[in-house]
Amino acid sequence: MKYEKLLPRFLEYVKVNTRSDENSTTTPSTQALVEFAHKMGEDMKALGLKDVHYLESNGYVIGTIPANTDKKVRKIGLLAHLDTADFNAEGVNPQILENYDGESVIQLGDTEFTLDPKDFPNLKNYKGQTLVHTDGTTLLGSDDKSGVAEIMTLADYLLNINPDFEHGEIRVGFGPDEEIGVGADKFDVADFDVDFAYTVDGGPLGELQYETFSAAGAVIEFQGKNVHPGTAKNMMVNALQLAIDYHNALPEFDRPEKTEGREGFFHLLKLDGTPEEARAQYIIRDHEEGKFNERKALMQEIADKMNAELGQNRVKPLIKDQYYNMAQIIEKDMSIIDIAKKAMENLDIAPIIEPIRGGTDGSKISFMGLPTPNLFAGGENMHGRFEFVSVQTMEKAVDTLLEIIRLNNEVAK
Protein backbone atom coordinates (compact mmCIF):
# COMPACT_ATOMS: atom_id res chain seq x y z
CA MET A 1 0.00 0.00 0.00
CA LYS A 2 1.31 3.42 -0.97
CA TYR A 3 0.36 5.14 2.29
CA GLU A 4 0.72 2.51 4.96
CA LYS A 5 -1.42 4.18 7.63
CA LEU A 6 -4.20 5.53 5.40
CA LEU A 7 -6.49 2.50 5.62
CA PRO A 8 -5.92 1.85 9.35
CA ARG A 9 -6.75 5.50 10.08
CA PHE A 10 -9.92 5.32 8.04
CA LEU A 11 -11.05 2.08 9.70
CA GLU A 12 -10.41 3.56 13.13
CA TYR A 13 -12.39 6.72 12.38
CA VAL A 14 -15.47 5.08 10.86
CA LYS A 15 -15.95 2.89 13.93
CA VAL A 16 -16.70 6.00 16.01
CA ASN A 17 -20.39 6.95 15.91
CA THR A 18 -20.48 10.63 15.00
CA ARG A 19 -23.96 10.83 13.51
CA SER A 20 -25.12 14.43 13.79
CA ASP A 21 -28.49 15.36 15.29
CA GLU A 22 -30.68 17.82 13.40
CA ASN A 23 -32.92 18.30 16.44
CA SER A 24 -30.07 19.45 18.66
CA THR A 25 -29.64 23.10 19.65
CA THR A 26 -25.96 22.77 20.59
CA THR A 27 -22.77 23.23 18.56
CA PRO A 28 -21.60 20.56 17.84
CA SER A 29 -24.92 18.75 17.80
CA THR A 30 -23.70 15.78 19.86
CA GLN A 31 -21.21 15.15 22.64
CA ALA A 32 -19.68 12.40 20.50
CA LEU A 33 -18.63 15.04 17.97
CA VAL A 34 -16.98 17.10 20.72
CA GLU A 35 -15.08 14.05 21.93
CA PHE A 36 -14.04 13.00 18.43
CA ALA A 37 -12.76 16.50 17.66
CA HIS A 38 -10.61 16.38 20.80
CA LYS A 39 -9.35 12.93 19.79
CA MET A 40 -8.44 14.30 16.36
CA GLY A 41 -6.63 17.16 18.06
CA GLU A 42 -4.47 14.71 19.98
CA ASP A 43 -3.76 12.78 16.77
CA MET A 44 -2.79 16.01 15.03
CA LYS A 45 -0.36 16.88 17.81
CA ALA A 46 1.12 13.38 17.65
CA LEU A 47 1.85 13.86 13.94
CA GLY A 48 3.60 17.13 14.64
CA LEU A 49 1.04 19.74 13.64
CA LYS A 50 1.50 23.04 15.47
CA ASP A 51 -0.96 25.43 17.13
CA VAL A 52 -3.56 22.68 17.44
CA HIS A 53 -6.65 24.11 19.11
CA TYR A 54 -10.32 23.33 19.55
CA LEU A 55 -12.78 26.18 19.09
CA GLU A 56 -15.65 25.96 21.56
CA SER A 57 -17.56 28.49 19.47
CA ASN A 58 -17.95 26.27 16.42
CA GLY A 59 -16.69 22.76 17.21
CA TYR A 60 -13.74 22.89 14.81
CA VAL A 61 -10.32 21.51 15.63
CA ILE A 62 -7.60 23.41 13.79
CA GLY A 63 -3.90 22.73 13.29
CA THR A 64 -0.96 23.98 11.23
CA ILE A 65 1.64 22.28 9.06
CA PRO A 66 4.37 24.95 9.18
CA ALA A 67 6.04 26.11 5.97
CA ASN A 68 9.49 24.70 5.24
CA THR A 69 10.35 27.23 2.51
CA ASP A 70 11.32 30.89 2.42
CA LYS A 71 9.22 31.47 -0.70
CA LYS A 72 6.12 33.63 -0.43
CA VAL A 73 3.68 30.77 -0.89
CA ARG A 74 -0.08 31.17 -0.66
CA LYS A 75 -1.42 29.50 2.47
CA ILE A 76 -3.71 26.54 1.76
CA GLY A 77 -6.52 25.29 3.99
CA LEU A 78 -7.79 21.70 3.96
CA LEU A 79 -11.16 20.92 5.51
CA ALA A 80 -13.27 17.82 6.18
CA HIS A 81 -16.25 17.12 8.40
CA LEU A 82 -16.37 14.69 11.29
CA ASP A 83 -20.09 13.95 11.37
CA THR A 84 -21.96 11.34 9.37
CA ALA A 85 -25.41 11.35 7.82
CA ASP A 86 -28.80 10.49 9.27
CA PHE A 87 -28.48 6.71 9.07
CA ASN A 88 -27.47 4.12 11.65
CA ALA A 89 -23.82 4.69 12.58
CA GLU A 90 -23.64 2.59 15.73
CA GLY A 91 -21.42 -0.46 15.44
CA VAL A 92 -19.92 0.28 12.03
CA ASN A 93 -18.15 -2.92 11.00
CA PRO A 94 -16.21 -2.19 7.79
CA GLN A 95 -15.56 -5.09 5.43
CA ILE A 96 -12.48 -5.22 3.19
CA LEU A 97 -12.63 -6.82 -0.25
CA GLU A 98 -9.30 -7.05 -2.04
CA ASN A 99 -8.85 -7.27 -5.80
CA TYR A 100 -12.54 -6.87 -6.67
CA ASP A 101 -13.27 -8.32 -10.11
CA GLY A 102 -15.75 -5.62 -11.13
CA GLU A 103 -18.52 -8.14 -11.78
CA SER A 104 -19.34 -10.15 -8.66
CA VAL A 105 -22.21 -9.41 -6.31
CA ILE A 106 -20.85 -8.31 -2.93
CA GLN A 107 -22.64 -9.71 0.11
CA LEU A 108 -23.08 -7.14 2.87
CA GLY A 109 -22.31 -9.11 6.02
CA ASP A 110 -25.00 -11.53 7.14
CA THR A 111 -27.85 -9.37 5.87
CA GLU A 112 -30.04 -9.86 2.83
CA PHE A 113 -28.48 -6.78 1.24
CA THR A 114 -25.93 -6.87 -1.55
CA LEU A 115 -23.92 -4.58 -3.78
CA ASP A 116 -24.90 -5.81 -7.22
CA PRO A 117 -23.33 -4.27 -10.36
CA LYS A 118 -26.79 -4.49 -11.95
CA ASP A 119 -28.07 -2.04 -9.34
CA PHE A 120 -24.82 -0.13 -8.87
CA PRO A 121 -23.03 -0.05 -12.25
CA ASN A 122 -20.35 2.21 -10.74
CA LEU A 123 -18.87 -0.98 -9.23
CA LYS A 124 -17.51 -1.84 -12.66
CA ASN A 125 -15.08 1.07 -12.33
CA TYR A 126 -13.25 -0.68 -9.49
CA LYS A 127 -11.91 -3.85 -11.08
CA GLY A 128 -8.68 -4.91 -9.38
CA GLN A 129 -9.10 -2.48 -6.50
CA THR A 130 -9.54 -2.91 -2.75
CA LEU A 131 -13.01 -1.89 -1.59
CA VAL A 132 -14.19 -1.08 1.91
CA HIS A 133 -17.94 -1.58 2.35
CA THR A 134 -20.50 -2.03 5.13
CA ASP A 135 -21.88 -5.16 6.76
CA GLY A 136 -25.36 -4.07 5.69
CA THR A 137 -26.49 -2.78 9.09
CA THR A 138 -24.97 0.73 9.07
CA LEU A 139 -23.56 3.33 6.77
CA LEU A 140 -19.81 3.32 6.25
CA GLY A 141 -18.97 6.93 7.04
CA SER A 142 -16.74 7.53 4.04
CA ASP A 143 -18.60 10.83 3.90
CA ASP A 144 -16.46 12.34 5.21
CA LYS A 145 -14.05 10.20 7.19
CA SER A 146 -12.32 9.37 3.92
CA GLY A 147 -11.48 13.06 3.70
CA VAL A 148 -10.37 13.16 7.33
CA ALA A 149 -8.07 10.15 6.86
CA GLU A 150 -6.67 11.54 3.62
CA ILE A 151 -5.81 14.91 5.15
CA MET A 152 -4.20 13.25 8.18
CA THR A 153 -2.19 11.00 5.85
CA LEU A 154 -1.05 14.05 3.91
CA ALA A 155 0.05 15.72 7.15
CA ASP A 156 1.95 12.59 8.20
CA TYR A 157 3.69 12.48 4.82
CA LEU A 158 4.80 16.12 4.93
CA LEU A 159 5.84 16.15 8.58
CA ASN A 160 7.34 12.69 9.05
CA ILE A 161 7.70 10.57 5.92
CA ASN A 162 9.09 13.15 3.50
CA PRO A 163 9.83 16.36 5.45
CA ASP A 164 11.99 17.64 2.57
CA PHE A 165 8.91 18.02 0.35
CA GLU A 166 8.86 21.81 -0.09
CA HIS A 167 5.62 23.57 0.87
CA GLY A 168 4.15 26.70 2.32
CA GLU A 169 1.98 26.88 5.42
CA ILE A 170 -0.98 24.52 5.38
CA ARG A 171 -3.88 24.74 7.79
CA VAL A 172 -6.03 21.74 8.60
CA GLY A 173 -9.57 21.93 9.97
CA PHE A 174 -12.08 19.27 10.99
CA GLY A 175 -15.60 20.38 11.85
CA PRO A 176 -19.03 19.11 12.89
CA ASP A 177 -22.57 19.02 11.56
CA GLU A 178 -22.07 19.34 7.81
CA GLU A 179 -24.72 16.70 7.24
CA ILE A 180 -27.39 18.75 9.01
CA GLY A 181 -26.46 21.91 7.13
CA VAL A 182 -25.10 24.02 9.99
CA GLY A 183 -21.47 22.93 10.26
CA ALA A 184 -19.99 26.05 8.70
CA ASP A 185 -22.44 28.56 10.17
CA LYS A 186 -19.93 29.67 12.80
CA PHE A 187 -16.73 28.96 10.90
CA ASP A 188 -13.99 31.43 11.85
CA VAL A 189 -12.25 32.55 8.65
CA ALA A 190 -9.94 34.91 10.53
CA ASP A 191 -8.75 32.14 12.85
CA PHE A 192 -8.20 29.75 9.93
CA ASP A 193 -6.12 32.44 8.21
CA VAL A 194 -5.41 31.02 4.74
CA ASP A 195 -5.54 32.39 1.20
CA PHE A 196 -7.76 29.65 -0.20
CA ALA A 197 -9.05 26.26 0.91
CA TYR A 198 -10.53 22.99 -0.28
CA THR A 199 -13.07 20.74 1.34
CA VAL A 200 -12.10 17.09 0.79
CA ASP A 201 -15.69 15.91 0.76
CA GLY A 202 -16.46 14.77 -2.78
CA GLY A 203 -17.27 11.38 -4.22
CA PRO A 204 -15.58 9.34 -6.96
CA LEU A 205 -12.12 9.82 -8.43
CA GLY A 206 -11.65 13.15 -10.19
CA GLU A 207 -14.53 15.14 -8.76
CA LEU A 208 -13.68 18.85 -8.61
CA GLN A 209 -16.64 20.98 -7.68
CA TYR A 210 -17.08 24.70 -7.33
CA GLU A 211 -20.74 25.10 -8.22
CA THR A 212 -23.43 24.14 -5.72
CA PHE A 213 -27.15 24.61 -5.39
CA SER A 214 -28.51 27.75 -3.86
CA ALA A 215 -30.77 26.53 -1.09
CA ALA A 216 -33.73 27.62 0.98
CA GLY A 217 -36.04 25.94 3.43
CA ALA A 218 -39.77 26.59 3.61
CA VAL A 219 -42.37 25.81 6.23
CA ILE A 220 -45.96 26.29 5.10
CA GLU A 221 -48.56 26.56 7.86
CA PHE A 222 -52.21 25.84 7.08
CA GLN A 223 -55.04 26.95 9.35
CA GLY A 224 -58.27 25.03 8.95
CA LYS A 225 -61.71 25.26 10.52
CA ASN A 226 -62.75 21.93 11.93
CA VAL A 227 -66.39 21.07 12.54
CA HIS A 228 -68.24 17.78 12.87
CA PRO A 229 -67.97 16.02 9.49
CA GLY A 230 -71.67 15.19 9.60
CA THR A 231 -72.60 18.86 9.42
CA ALA A 232 -69.51 20.17 7.65
CA LYS A 233 -70.97 21.24 4.31
CA ASN A 234 -70.01 24.82 3.43
CA MET A 235 -68.41 25.24 6.85
CA MET A 236 -65.37 22.97 7.25
CA VAL A 237 -61.98 24.06 5.98
CA ASN A 238 -59.71 21.03 6.16
CA ALA A 239 -56.11 22.12 6.75
CA LEU A 240 -54.80 18.84 5.36
CA GLN A 241 -56.72 19.40 2.13
CA LEU A 242 -55.23 22.90 1.93
CA ALA A 243 -51.78 21.34 2.21
CA ILE A 244 -52.60 18.88 -0.57
CA ASP A 245 -53.92 21.65 -2.80
CA TYR A 246 -50.84 23.75 -2.14
CA HIS A 247 -48.48 20.91 -3.01
CA ASN A 248 -50.40 20.10 -6.18
CA ALA A 249 -50.07 23.73 -7.28
CA LEU A 250 -46.29 23.38 -7.45
CA PRO A 251 -44.80 22.27 -10.80
CA GLU A 252 -45.40 18.54 -11.11
CA PHE A 253 -42.01 17.67 -12.57
CA ASP A 254 -39.87 19.94 -10.38
CA ARG A 255 -39.16 17.23 -7.85
CA PRO A 256 -35.87 15.47 -6.97
CA GLU A 257 -36.99 12.18 -8.49
CA LYS A 258 -37.73 13.87 -11.82
CA THR A 259 -34.74 16.23 -12.15
CA GLU A 260 -31.03 15.98 -12.86
CA GLY A 261 -27.99 18.02 -13.85
CA ARG A 262 -28.68 21.73 -13.50
CA GLU A 263 -32.42 21.33 -12.94
CA GLY A 264 -33.75 22.64 -9.65
CA PHE A 265 -36.63 21.36 -7.56
CA PHE A 266 -39.09 21.66 -4.69
CA HIS A 267 -38.82 18.77 -2.24
CA LEU A 268 -41.55 17.97 0.28
CA LEU A 269 -39.76 16.66 3.36
CA LYS A 270 -42.60 16.35 5.83
CA LEU A 271 -46.36 16.81 6.04
CA ASP A 272 -48.34 16.44 9.23
CA GLY A 273 -51.39 17.86 10.91
CA THR A 274 -55.12 17.57 11.48
CA PRO A 275 -58.16 19.10 9.80
CA GLU A 276 -57.70 22.05 12.18
CA GLU A 277 -54.07 22.81 11.38
CA ALA A 278 -51.32 21.35 9.24
CA ARG A 279 -47.70 21.99 8.41
CA ALA A 280 -45.61 21.16 5.35
CA GLN A 281 -41.82 21.36 5.25
CA TYR A 282 -39.97 21.87 1.94
CA ILE A 283 -36.49 22.48 0.64
CA ILE A 284 -35.96 24.61 -2.47
CA ARG A 285 -32.93 24.13 -4.71
CA ASP A 286 -31.57 25.67 -7.91
CA HIS A 287 -28.16 26.47 -9.38
CA GLU A 288 -29.17 29.73 -11.07
CA GLU A 289 -29.85 32.77 -8.89
CA GLY A 290 -32.76 33.99 -11.01
CA LYS A 291 -34.54 30.65 -11.01
CA PHE A 292 -33.85 30.22 -7.29
CA ASN A 293 -35.59 33.52 -6.56
CA GLU A 294 -38.45 32.60 -8.89
CA ARG A 295 -39.01 29.37 -6.96
CA LYS A 296 -39.25 31.21 -3.65
CA ALA A 297 -41.59 33.78 -5.20
CA LEU A 298 -43.83 31.02 -6.58
CA MET A 299 -44.31 29.51 -3.14
CA GLN A 300 -45.50 32.89 -1.88
CA GLU A 301 -47.70 33.45 -4.94
CA ILE A 302 -49.50 30.13 -4.46
CA ALA A 303 -50.21 31.03 -0.85
CA ASP A 304 -51.47 34.49 -1.83
CA LYS A 305 -53.79 33.02 -4.46
CA MET A 306 -55.21 30.43 -2.08
CA ASN A 307 -55.77 33.04 0.62
CA ALA A 308 -57.57 35.29 -1.87
CA GLU A 309 -59.86 32.42 -2.90
CA LEU A 310 -60.49 31.48 0.73
CA GLY A 311 -61.14 35.07 1.77
CA GLN A 312 -58.86 34.59 4.76
CA ASN A 313 -55.13 34.20 5.42
CA ARG A 314 -55.13 30.49 6.07
CA VAL A 315 -51.87 29.67 4.24
CA LYS A 316 -48.68 31.16 5.70
CA PRO A 317 -45.31 30.41 4.06
CA LEU A 318 -42.11 30.96 6.05
CA ILE A 319 -39.14 30.85 3.67
CA LYS A 320 -35.52 31.12 4.78
CA ASP A 321 -32.36 31.02 2.68
CA GLN A 322 -29.82 28.37 3.72
CA TYR A 323 -26.79 28.76 1.45
CA TYR A 324 -25.88 30.04 -2.01
CA ASN A 325 -24.11 28.77 -5.11
CA MET A 326 -20.43 29.32 -4.35
CA ALA A 327 -19.64 29.68 -8.06
CA GLN A 328 -20.51 33.36 -7.59
CA ILE A 329 -17.39 33.65 -5.42
CA ILE A 330 -15.05 31.07 -6.99
CA GLU A 331 -15.47 32.40 -10.54
CA LYS A 332 -13.91 35.71 -9.49
CA ASP A 333 -10.55 33.90 -9.31
CA MET A 334 -10.43 30.51 -11.01
CA SER A 335 -6.76 29.93 -10.18
CA ILE A 336 -7.61 27.55 -7.34
CA ILE A 337 -9.72 25.47 -9.73
CA ASP A 338 -7.01 25.60 -12.37
CA ILE A 339 -4.34 24.38 -9.95
CA ALA A 340 -6.50 21.47 -8.77
CA LYS A 341 -7.38 20.57 -12.35
CA LYS A 342 -3.72 20.67 -13.35
CA ALA A 343 -2.77 18.54 -10.35
CA MET A 344 -5.22 15.83 -11.39
CA GLU A 345 -4.12 15.92 -15.01
CA ASN A 346 -0.49 15.59 -13.94
CA LEU A 347 -1.51 12.39 -12.14
CA ASP A 348 -3.49 11.05 -15.13
CA ILE A 349 -6.75 11.64 -13.29
CA ALA A 350 -9.56 12.96 -15.49
CA PRO A 351 -11.15 15.93 -13.68
CA ILE A 352 -14.92 15.70 -13.35
CA ILE A 353 -16.15 19.29 -13.10
CA GLU A 354 -19.92 19.27 -12.67
CA PRO A 355 -22.37 21.20 -10.49
CA ILE A 356 -23.05 19.60 -7.13
CA ARG A 357 -26.70 18.71 -6.66
CA GLY A 358 -26.33 19.69 -3.04
CA GLY A 359 -24.06 21.85 -0.95
CA THR A 360 -20.87 21.66 1.06
CA ASP A 361 -19.41 23.56 3.97
CA GLY A 362 -17.47 25.38 1.28
CA SER A 363 -20.70 26.96 0.04
CA LYS A 364 -21.02 29.02 3.20
CA ILE A 365 -17.30 29.47 3.81
CA SER A 366 -16.83 30.89 0.31
CA PHE A 367 -19.41 33.57 1.06
CA MET A 368 -17.50 34.40 4.24
CA GLY A 369 -14.62 35.49 2.02
CA LEU A 370 -12.60 32.28 1.78
CA PRO A 371 -12.96 30.54 -1.61
CA THR A 372 -13.40 26.83 -0.85
CA PRO A 373 -14.16 24.41 -3.70
CA ASN A 374 -14.57 20.67 -3.17
CA LEU A 375 -12.24 17.76 -4.04
CA PHE A 376 -13.00 14.06 -4.34
CA ALA A 377 -12.59 11.87 -1.26
CA GLY A 378 -13.64 8.58 -2.88
CA GLY A 379 -16.95 7.54 -1.39
CA GLU A 380 -19.76 6.01 -3.45
CA ASN A 381 -23.45 5.45 -2.60
CA MET A 382 -23.03 7.61 0.48
CA HIS A 383 -25.46 8.03 3.39
CA GLY A 384 -26.57 4.43 3.66
CA ARG A 385 -25.83 0.72 3.88
CA PHE A 386 -24.67 0.52 0.24
CA GLU A 387 -21.80 2.95 0.78
CA PHE A 388 -18.31 1.88 -0.23
CA VAL A 389 -14.92 3.41 -0.99
CA SER A 390 -11.86 2.32 -2.95
CA VAL A 391 -8.55 2.39 -1.10
CA GLN A 392 -6.81 3.23 -4.36
CA THR A 393 -9.05 6.27 -4.85
CA MET A 394 -8.25 7.42 -1.33
CA GLU A 395 -4.55 7.11 -2.13
CA LYS A 396 -5.05 9.19 -5.26
CA ALA A 397 -6.83 11.82 -3.18
CA VAL A 398 -3.67 12.15 -1.07
CA ASP A 399 -1.59 12.27 -4.26
CA THR A 400 -3.81 15.07 -5.56
CA LEU A 401 -3.42 17.12 -2.39
CA LEU A 402 0.36 16.72 -2.58
CA GLU A 403 0.41 17.78 -6.22
CA ILE A 404 -1.73 20.84 -5.48
CA ILE A 405 0.74 21.80 -2.76
CA ARG A 406 3.68 21.25 -5.12
CA LEU A 407 2.12 23.35 -7.87
CA ASN A 408 1.20 26.08 -5.41
CA ASN A 409 4.81 26.17 -4.26
CA GLU A 410 6.05 26.17 -7.85
CA VAL A 411 4.29 29.42 -8.75
CA ALA A 412 5.53 31.21 -5.62
CA LYS A 413 8.32 33.77 -5.76
Curated annotation (Swiss-Prot):
A GO biological process held by the record: peptide catabolic process
SUPFAM superfamilies: Bacterial exopeptidase dimerisation domain (SSF55031), Zn-dependent exopeptidases (SSF53187)
GO molecular function: metallopeptidase activity; tripeptide aminopeptidase activity; zinc ion binding
Activity regulation description: Inhibited by EDTA, by the reducing agents dithiothreitol and 13-mercaptoethanol, and by the divalent cation Cu(2+).
Keywords recorded for this protein, A-Z: Aminopeptidase, Cytoplasm, Hydrolase, Metal-binding, Metalloprotease, Protease, Zinc
Cofactor notes: Binds 2 Zn(2+) ions per subunit.
Membrane-spanning ranges: none
Record-annotated active site: 83, 178
GO cellular component assignments: cytosol
Enzyme class: hydrolase
Residues annotated for Zn(2+) 1 binding in this entry: 81, 143, 201
Subcellular location: Cytoplasm
Function per UniProt: Cleaves the N-terminal amino acid of tripeptides. Has a broad specificity for tripeptides with no clear preference for a particular tripeptide. Tripeptides with proline in the second position are an exception and are not hydrolyzed. Does not hydrolyze dipeptides, tetrapeptides, or oligopeptides.
Protein family: Belongs to the peptidase M20B family.
Name the record gives this protein: Peptidase T
Originating species: Lactococcus lactis subsp. cremoris (Streptococcus cremoris)
Origin organism lineage: Bacteria, Bacillati, Bacillota, Bacilli, Lactobacillales
